[in-house]
Amino acid sequence: MDGIKFTLTYSALKMFGKQLYSNVSSAISELVANGLDAKAPNIYLTIDIRDKMNSYVEVFDEGKGMSATDIADHYIKIGYNKRRNERGLNDGKTLGRKGIGKLAALYLSDCFTIITKTVNSELTCWKLDVSGLDEDDSPQLEPVGIDEYCELESYKKLVSLGHGTIICLQNVNMKGLGDKAFESLECRLSNLFLYDKLEQKIWIKLIQSNTTPNCFLPINKQIAFKNLAYVYASDKSYVKECEHNTFTMSYKTKNGIDKKMTSDTEIVSFADTEFHVSGEQEFFGVKKHYELDGWIGIHATIDGEDAKYNDDRYIKNQFYNPNQLRVYVRNKLAMPNMIEYL
């Protein structure tokens, strides 16, 4: 089997990657999103940071997998649009951003391996190594032997399952990332799906030392509902935790005296506001019904101490900002933060 060359140069791929991803968390989230797009019921993320300068990241999804033809025709194409080209398969539910998942892998590592299989194709293993590559050269995916990966738990599960994809990334630099960074990664991953609505499941195993338990933990949606002052919802069942909730916030008087106030969270139905939106629109030549569904919440405070007092699930740091207006389409994240476009 011959190698498969990218159509863009190494320098162009690096440039696109740096523009798309601001940190390790955003790049890893993109790889996980690709697993959700592959219809995987489970996505397993392993991060081994025992040597932070040379960390190991592995994403295994139980999705449909890729054949050698899929790799050649789709995977290496930057900007391949699944929504337009595979409508029957994705049904408008694509989450990854138009064929740029491989840029996320390149952002994280100069060397990564793809092990993949579909129900109707044989298992193949590919490696991309750009270390030492000239800026004007085009990277090439090379077919490699599977022997060194046969002992991976994910490989054994893939063989047993008969379909799926494993991406192994070597020498990922995670120096300077501490507990807050990885806590923030879990928040970012949980934002990929709507609260309590996605049947697919994301699992994570963070290996920090030789004594770390060898088990995956589920990524659970965590929203600091009890720190919300106002909530606008199409269905109040989405925000049950806000019912009969009282929050506290600090303020200064005109004389500079620190005070605290408490108040009840106010919940307003979309039906009573201009937020109630529905109708019909043509999508890719097909007329479909659309309706704005969900909720918008306004935090009572972004002061860390007060917010944590209201709800210990509140997280805000250099790696994660909860003040986002996220848009979901059919239960999956379509726009991470609409506020940036307003």
Task: Give short role names for the model-derived ranges.
Residues D136-P213:
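ATP-binding catalytic core of ATPases
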Residues T116, L169-N171, V329-N331:
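Flexible glycine-/small-residue-rich
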Residues S109, V159, I166, E186-K197, ...:
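N-terminal phosphate-binding caps/lids of nucleotide- and nucleic-acid-binding domains
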Residues P41-I43, M53, D110, H163-T165, ...:
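Residues at beta-strand starts and edge strands
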Residues L206-L342:
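GHKL/Bergerat-fold ATPase module in large chromosome/replication-associated machines
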Residues M1-I166:
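GHKL (Bergerat-fold) ATPase N-terminal catalytic module, capturing the glycine-rich phosphate-binding loop
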Residues V32, K102, S154-K156, S190, ...:
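Generic recognition of flexible, low-complexity loop/linker segments
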Residues S67-T69, G176-G178, M335-M338:
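Short helix/loop capping segments that flank catalytic or ligand/cofactor-binding pockets
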